[in-house]
Amino acid sequence: MDSVAFEDVAVNFTLEEWALLDPSQKNLYRDVMRETFRNLASVGKQWEDQNIEDPFKIPRRNISHIPERLCESKEGGQGEETFSQIPDGILNKKTPGVKPCESSVCGEVGMGPSSLNRHIRDHTGREPNEYQEYGKKSYTRNQCGRALSYHRSFPVRERTHPGGKPYDCKECGETFISLVSIRRHMLTHRGGVPYKCKVCGKAFDYPSLFRIHERSHTGEKPYECKQCGKAFSCSSYIRIHERTHTGDKPYECKQCGKAFSCSKYIRIHERTHTGEKPYECKQCGKAFRCASSVRSHERTHTGEKLFECKECGKALTCLASVRRHMIKHTGNGPYKCKVCGKAFDFPSSFRIHERTHTGEKPYDCKQCGKAFSCSSSFRKHERIHTGEKPYKCTKCGKAFSRSSYFRIHERTHTGEKPYECKQCGKAFSRSTYFRVHEKIHTGEKPYENPNPNASVVPVLS
């Protein structure tokens, strides 16, 4: 009868596949493997070689006799240890016929392989010889010259060497500030990336990231919220979304105590304290705290409008504008004014609106003393004093202090007339012209112009 190979009875995963499993699937895997170990122990089988390099994809091994220990530490020439990389929880004290891992340094038992790795490191100060993805130690710490073979070692070493660019490429010596950066850089030495999108050409070094990206083209959203039914393409997105229902905000600002549901939001918020604005508009030089803000702003220069209202067809530059606009049609919004019933999507917009009722104007101009209810109106006013005109026409060179004036001016070049009269079909480039025209049909005469030949339309600048 042929000898039994471990691969015949084991369920194998790649590292990326293991990362994609949810906790219940991982628990099921551990239960199955635990039962497998029990069965093998009961029939008197053991692995001859415990020096397994890959933590999940275990190569074919013959099983020949009863184990004294299924996990065994083997001390290397320089104090490095190698271990069977089986996930913690498969082997434990409750598994009959199986002895858990034992430390070669102090003799302590009762640990899983990963726990033993940490335990040995605490004794020796050295990293275990972990999983090798490409067959050599490609990443080094430039502060201490230490070679690290597997990216999970880095967060531990990160705390040892704060500041600077801690990741050093052994191939060319270039240094990097983050692990993500050096992983991308290593692709240049490996001759490109293994996973490339056929639709847009974007490349990925991990299949899990590639599969998530593909869903942006297919529209697949396998993760659905049980509370509201909203679907997501990635498991991390649904976890963040679920916090809107639970109210969980695990990320708290150390400066002001404000809490956030997502790490991305707190990083953006922290810039309000530091004053950091890393995203700059190439057209006018205006800086922003987050990438989405600069992208929305850049559309004021290009005139690009990606979003269209399904109700009225109005084109808008960003998703936030669409949400705000849709409230006009639906009348629904999480923040509703008790005085006039107007609804808002964001608390900041709601607070600004409330000031129209209270008369509060917290922003004072130091030049002329004029006060404003919101910071954006105040900034626009300041340009009257400074003469700043950040919006410049690429066609004729004329500059404007406000983006709205700039967009209106652009229509003189493009011929665009977005305001059309439903009565007679006549179109206009500006809403003021359109409103004046409508009164011809209604017969309304709200004011009388003493000089009919004079223009009543304000000059844009």
Swiss-Prot record:
Name the PROSITE patterns for this protein: KRAB (PS50805), ZINC_FINGER_C2H2_1 (PS00028), ZINC_FINGER_C2H2_2 (PS50157)
Localization terms from the record = Nucleus
Task: Decide whether keyword Ribosomal protein is in the record.
Answer: no
The keyword Zinc appears for this protein: yes
For this protein, the record's SMART domains field holds:
KRAB, ZnF_C2H2
CDD domains associated with the record: KRAB_A-box
Q: Which GO terms label this protein's molecular function in UniProt? A: DNA-binding transcription factor activity, RNA polymerase II-specific; RNA polymerase II transcription regulatory region sequence-specific DNA binding; zinc ion binding
Family matches, as PANTHER family: TRANSCRIPTIONAL REPRESSOR PROTEIN YY, ZINC FINGER PROTEIN 143
Task performed by this protein: May be involved in transcriptional regulation.
- Spell out the protein name for this chain: Zinc finger protein 627
Q: Organism, per UniProt?
A: Homo sapiens (Human)
